[in-house]
Amino acid sequence: MKWNKVLFTVMALCTSLLLGAVAAEARKAAVPDDDPNVPYRTFDSTPAITMGPLLLDMSDTSVIVEWMTDAPSDGRVSYGEGKLDHEVVPQMDGMVPVGTMHRVVIEGLAPGRTYQYCVASRRVVALKPYWPDMGKTVESAVGSFTTFGAAKKTTRFAVITDTHENVERIQALTSLIHQVPVDFVVHTGDSLNYVVSENQIKDRFLEPMATGLKATTPLLYVRGNHDYRGEMARSFGDYLHAQDGGYVYTRDDGPLHMVMVDTGEDKPDGTQVYAGLNNLRDYRTREWAWFRHVLADEPRTKAAPFTVVFGHDPSWGWVDGQETQWTQAANQARIDLFIAGHEHHYQHIKPGEHGNDFPVLVVGQDQVVRVEASDTELTVKVVDRAGKLVDAFTLRRKPKS
């Protein structure tokens, strides 16, 4: 009996050691730290591009390229003049982003030059800590863009507004835009009724805009009051922020200096409908300081032949009763034109009607504004969805000092 117990103990110990060795080998096979160059697995799984590419916030030396995929993927952009001999691989805190929304900034471009580009995304099947499982790569067709350049003699652009999730409206307006070549398109806000999901942002705005702009015409976006509303409104900037991470910015193209303002909400923060979740008072106060600085101190405001301000609300939005000071600042800077939306019907507010020394153009929902600027004049035409002329006028260059 005694020897049987000893034999049983020895057998149990051997079994335990054997199982431990097997487990150790299994762990070693799972995480072979001694050979990090063992190839990762690649599966026959290719993502599809579901939106884009869309060119956003063009400048003279940079541009944002956005697209979306139907499955988690990485993203990169190849670009160049004549051949795709440069590549941008984005990083966030040292890691390549993985997801379905892809946003890459191409920097270091030359002003007024035309580039070709192509986006690519590789499927990430399983984002494991070691040897992530990868899939195959999808590439877009090759598109092109031309950077802004202050040395250009002329610039042409179109403006639309308040599309409010109406895909058919976007399709009709962008089709109308392309009847005459333009360098870029401005959307002055309220692309959605309120922001609730990524699919809504994609399906009701980004995808139809990207399709309509044909991967060649850049979009400049101005935030509207409806863009403040909904559970995803706080993430809306992930899709439409300018390059510096905000909604207020300036851009220059040819004889044109552009000032993009965020006119905020149309009611005070304390209005019950907001439940105390807005703080436009502080936000607009900071924006007011920025606006004064841009108009008074930014050299191009005085040097450019024409300065155009873009905003959603033609009365500057809710600014705690200080609408007059915004108009006065614009008057002092001798801006040439303010283009807005918000009212859903066309208005041409002429100088002097509301204390303004400049015309205010309020674009209707189903209209396209075409603007062409040269060193001496700025011509404006407004057409409806049928292409019928609604209004037309010309502004002559005026002294800025």
Can you describe what each PLM-predicted range is?
Residues 1-3, 367:
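N-terminal secretory signal peptides that target proteins for export/translocation
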Residues 120-121, 263, 310-314, 342:
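Short, well-ordered beta-to-alpha junction loops that form the rim of enzyme active sites
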Residues 158-161, 184-190, 217-225, 308-312, ...:
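Active-site neighborhood of phospho(di)ester-bond hydrolases with catalytic His/Asp-centered motifs
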Residues 164-168, 278-285, 320-321:
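Soluble non-cytosolic domains of exported or imported proteins
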